[in-house]
Protein backbone atom coordinates (compact mmCIF):
# COMPACT_ATOMS: atom_id res chain seq x y z
CA UNK A 1 0.00 0.00 0.00
CA UNK A 2 1.57 3.25 -1.13
CA UNK A 3 0.56 6.90 -1.14
CA UNK A 4 -1.78 6.68 1.85
CA UNK A 5 -3.36 9.61 3.67
CA UNK A 6 -2.59 10.09 7.36
CA UNK A 7 -6.03 8.75 8.36
CA UNK A 8 -8.63 6.40 6.89
CA UNK A 9 -12.37 6.00 7.35
CA UNK A 10 -13.87 2.58 6.65
CA UNK A 11 -17.64 2.89 6.29
CA UNK A 12 -18.99 -0.58 6.99
CA UNK A 13 -16.07 -2.08 8.91
CA UNK A 14 -17.18 -5.72 8.88
CA UNK A 15 -15.57 -8.87 7.49
CA UNK A 16 -13.57 -7.17 4.72
CA UNK A 17 -13.22 -3.91 6.64
CA UNK A 18 -11.40 -5.53 9.54
CA UNK A 19 -8.84 -7.11 7.21
CA UNK A 20 -8.35 -3.76 5.48
CA UNK A 21 -8.03 -1.97 8.82
CA UNK A 22 -5.27 -4.33 9.94
CA UNK A 23 -3.25 -3.52 6.83
CA UNK A 24 -3.76 0.22 7.17
CA UNK A 25 -2.69 0.10 10.81
CA UNK A 26 0.45 -1.79 9.79
CA UNK A 27 1.28 1.20 7.58
CA UNK A 28 0.94 3.63 10.47
CA UNK A 29 -2.44 5.10 9.62
CA UNK A 30 -5.02 6.18 12.14
CA UNK A 31 -8.15 4.23 11.21
CA UNK A 32 -11.81 5.01 11.91
CA UNK A 33 -14.37 2.27 11.26
CA UNK A 34 -18.17 2.46 11.33
CA UNK A 35 -20.29 -0.31 12.84
CA UNK A 36 -23.89 -0.65 14.04
CA UNK A 37 -23.45 -2.91 17.07
CA UNK A 38 -21.61 -2.03 20.29
CA UNK A 39 -20.07 -5.51 20.42
CA UNK A 40 -18.52 -4.85 17.00
CA UNK A 41 -17.29 -1.48 18.21
CA UNK A 42 -15.43 -3.13 21.07
CA UNK A 43 -13.86 -5.64 18.67
CA UNK A 44 -12.58 -2.76 16.51
CA UNK A 45 -11.21 -0.98 19.55
CA UNK A 46 -9.22 -4.10 20.41
CA UNK A 47 -7.69 -4.00 16.92
CA UNK A 48 -6.62 -0.39 17.41
CA UNK A 49 -9.40 1.09 15.26
CA UNK A 50 -11.41 4.10 16.42
CA UNK A 51 -15.00 2.73 16.34
CA UNK A 52 -17.79 4.94 15.01
CA UNK A 53 -21.40 3.98 15.76
CA UNK A 54 -23.23 4.82 12.55
CA UNK A 55 -26.18 3.68 10.43
CA UNK A 56 -25.83 4.87 6.82
CA UNK A 57 -29.61 5.11 6.38
CA UNK A 58 -30.02 7.28 9.50
CA UNK A 59 -28.54 10.77 9.08
CA UNK A 60 -29.13 11.49 12.77
CA UNK A 61 -26.20 9.16 13.52
CA UNK A 62 -23.79 11.10 11.29
CA UNK A 63 -22.40 13.54 13.90
CA UNK A 64 -20.31 10.56 15.06
CA UNK A 65 -18.21 11.06 11.89
CA UNK A 66 -16.87 14.40 13.13
CA UNK A 67 -13.49 13.11 14.44
CA UNK A 68 -12.71 11.44 11.10
CA UNK A 69 -13.79 14.46 9.06
CA UNK A 70 -11.45 16.67 11.09
CA UNK A 71 -8.41 14.81 9.70
CA UNK A 72 -5.94 16.87 7.69
CA UNK A 73 -6.24 14.29 4.92
CA UNK A 74 -8.53 11.29 4.74
CA UNK A 75 -8.86 8.16 2.64
CA UNK A 76 -12.41 6.75 2.61
CA UNK A 77 -13.43 3.16 1.91
CA UNK A 78 -17.15 2.45 1.53
CA UNK A 79 -17.76 -1.25 2.23
CA UNK A 80 -21.41 -1.32 3.28
CA UNK A 81 -23.20 -4.57 2.24
CA UNK A 82 -26.27 -4.00 0.02
CA UNK A 83 -28.79 -5.55 2.41
CA UNK A 84 -31.26 -8.35 1.81
CA UNK A 85 -34.31 -8.31 -0.43
CA UNK A 86 -37.40 -7.83 1.69
CA UNK A 87 -35.31 -6.59 4.61
CA UNK A 88 -35.53 -3.35 6.54
CA UNK A 89 -33.92 -1.10 5.50
CA UNK A 90 -34.34 -2.17 1.89
CA UNK A 91 -31.43 -2.65 -0.53
CA UNK A 92 -32.47 0.59 -2.27
CA UNK A 93 -32.30 2.49 1.01
CA UNK A 94 -28.94 0.97 1.91
CA UNK A 95 -27.25 1.29 -1.48
CA UNK A 96 -28.60 4.54 -2.92
CA UNK A 97 -29.67 6.24 0.29
CA UNK A 98 -26.50 5.25 2.13
CA UNK A 99 -24.15 6.44 -0.60
CA UNK A 100 -26.06 9.71 -1.03
CA UNK A 101 -26.02 10.42 2.71
CA UNK A 102 -22.35 9.58 3.18
CA UNK A 103 -21.07 11.50 0.16
CA UNK A 104 -22.84 14.63 1.41
CA UNK A 105 -21.03 14.24 4.72
CA UNK A 106 -17.67 13.69 3.04
CA UNK A 107 -17.82 17.14 1.47
CA UNK A 108 -17.14 18.49 4.96
CA UNK A 109 -13.78 16.72 5.18
CA UNK A 110 -10.42 16.78 3.42
CA UNK A 111 -11.02 13.57 1.49
CA UNK A 112 -8.00 12.68 -0.60
CA UNK A 113 -9.29 9.43 -2.04
CA UNK A 114 -12.61 7.60 -1.98
CA UNK A 115 -13.00 3.90 -2.80
CA UNK A 116 -16.42 2.30 -3.20
CA UNK A 117 -16.54 -1.49 -3.02
CA UNK A 118 -19.20 -2.68 -5.45
CA UNK A 119 -19.82 -6.15 -6.88
CA UNK A 120 -19.38 -8.16 -10.06
CA UNK A 121 -23.18 -8.51 -9.87
CA UNK A 122 -23.34 -5.36 -12.02
CA UNK A 123 -22.25 -7.43 -15.03
CA UNK A 124 -25.05 -9.95 -14.89
CA UNK A 125 -23.58 -12.16 -17.60
CA UNK A 126 -24.04 -15.84 -16.75
CA UNK A 127 -22.93 -17.54 -19.97
CA UNK A 128 -19.44 -18.39 -18.74
CA UNK A 129 -17.65 -15.77 -20.86
CA UNK A 130 -14.75 -13.61 -19.72
CA UNK A 131 -15.62 -10.42 -17.85
CA UNK A 132 -13.17 -7.61 -17.07
CA UNK A 133 -13.17 -3.90 -16.22
CA UNK A 134 -13.91 -3.00 -19.86
CA UNK A 135 -16.99 -5.24 -20.08
CA UNK A 136 -20.24 -3.30 -20.39
CA UNK A 137 -22.33 -3.85 -17.22
CA UNK A 138 -25.66 -5.54 -17.91
CA UNK A 139 -27.15 -6.23 -14.48
CA UNK A 140 -29.85 -8.86 -14.61
CA UNK A 141 -31.39 -8.30 -11.19
CA UNK A 142 -32.45 -5.50 -8.87
CA UNK A 143 -29.34 -5.76 -6.70
CA UNK A 144 -27.02 -5.37 -9.68
CA UNK A 145 -29.02 -2.44 -11.05
CA UNK A 146 -28.96 -0.66 -7.69
CA UNK A 147 -25.22 -1.22 -7.30
CA UNK A 148 -24.56 0.20 -10.76
CA UNK A 149 -26.67 3.25 -9.96
CA UNK A 150 -24.81 3.60 -6.66
CA UNK A 151 -21.49 3.56 -8.52
CA UNK A 152 -22.76 6.51 -10.54
CA UNK A 153 -23.61 8.45 -7.39
CA UNK A 154 -20.14 7.79 -6.03
CA UNK A 155 -18.35 8.91 -9.18
CA UNK A 156 -20.41 12.10 -9.27
CA UNK A 157 -18.39 13.40 -6.32
CA UNK A 158 -15.72 14.70 -8.64
CA UNK A 159 -16.42 13.73 -12.22
CA UNK A 160 -13.33 12.53 -14.02
CA UNK A 161 -11.19 12.64 -10.87
CA UNK A 162 -9.38 9.29 -10.45
CA UNK A 163 -9.33 9.75 -6.68
CA UNK A 164 -12.94 8.54 -6.61
CA UNK A 165 -12.70 4.89 -7.49
CA UNK A 166 -14.98 1.87 -7.74
CA UNK A 167 -13.77 -1.68 -7.10
CA UNK A 168 -16.04 -4.54 -8.16
CA UNK A 169 -15.38 -7.60 -6.03
CA UNK A 170 -16.57 -11.16 -6.42
CA UNK A 171 -17.89 -13.17 -3.47
CA UNK A 172 -15.63 -13.10 -0.42
CA UNK A 173 -14.25 -16.15 1.28
CA UNK A 174 -11.65 -16.73 3.98
CA UNK A 175 -11.38 -17.62 7.65
CA UNK A 176 -14.87 -18.05 9.05
CA UNK A 177 -16.53 -17.74 5.65
CA UNK A 178 -16.35 -20.79 3.39
CA UNK A 179 -18.92 -21.44 0.67
CA UNK A 180 -21.05 -24.44 1.63
CA UNK A 181 -19.36 -24.88 5.01
CA UNK A 182 -22.63 -25.14 6.94
CA UNK A 183 -23.95 -27.88 4.67
CA UNK A 184 -20.69 -29.82 4.85
CA UNK A 185 -20.64 -29.66 8.64
CA UNK A 186 -24.22 -30.92 8.76
CA UNK A 187 -23.53 -33.70 6.28
CA UNK A 188 -26.01 -32.23 3.80
CA UNK A 189 -25.45 -32.25 0.02
CA UNK A 190 -24.34 -29.06 -1.70
CA UNK A 191 -27.20 -27.90 -3.91
CA UNK A 192 -26.35 -26.45 -7.32
CA UNK A 193 -24.87 -27.12 -10.73
CA UNK A 194 -21.67 -29.17 -10.20
CA UNK A 195 -20.27 -27.78 -13.47
CA UNK A 196 -20.83 -24.14 -12.53
CA UNK A 197 -17.91 -21.84 -11.74
CA UNK A 198 -17.70 -19.89 -8.50
CA UNK A 199 -16.64 -16.25 -8.72
CA UNK A 200 -14.75 -15.69 -5.46
CA UNK A 201 -11.90 -13.63 -3.99
CA UNK A 202 -10.09 -14.25 -0.71
CA UNK A 203 -10.73 -11.52 1.86
CA UNK A 204 -7.01 -10.90 2.38
CA UNK A 205 -6.44 -10.46 -1.36
CA UNK A 206 -9.34 -8.00 -1.46
CA UNK A 207 -7.89 -6.04 1.46
CA UNK A 208 -4.48 -5.87 -0.21
Task: Label the predicted regions.
Residues 8-12:
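Conserved N-terminal Rossmann-fold NAD(P)-binding element of oxidoreductases
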Residues 13-14, 169:
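Glycine-rich Rossmann-fold phosphate-binding loop(s) that bind the pyrophosphate
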Residues 17-18:
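N-terminal Rossmann-fold NAD(P) dinucleotide-binding loop
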Residues 47-73:
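Conserved Rossmann-fold cofactor-binding substructure of NAD(P)-dependent oxidoreductases
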Residues 72-115:
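NAD(P)-cofactor binding segment of oxidoreductase domains
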Residues 100-140:
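Conserved Rossmann-fold NAD(P)-dependent oxidoreductase catalytic core, especially the SDR/UDP-sugar
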Residues 127-166:
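Catalytic helix-loop patch of NAD(P)-dependent Rossmann-fold dehydrogenases
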Residues 172, 178-182, 191-208:
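Substrate-positioning beta->alpha
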Amino acid sequence: MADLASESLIVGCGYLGRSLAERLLEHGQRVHGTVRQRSDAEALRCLGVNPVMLEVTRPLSFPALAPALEAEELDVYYLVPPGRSGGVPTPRQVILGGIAHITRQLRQGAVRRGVLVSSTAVYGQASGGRVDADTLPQPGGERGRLLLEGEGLWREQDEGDPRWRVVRLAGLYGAGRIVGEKAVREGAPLVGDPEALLNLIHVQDAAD
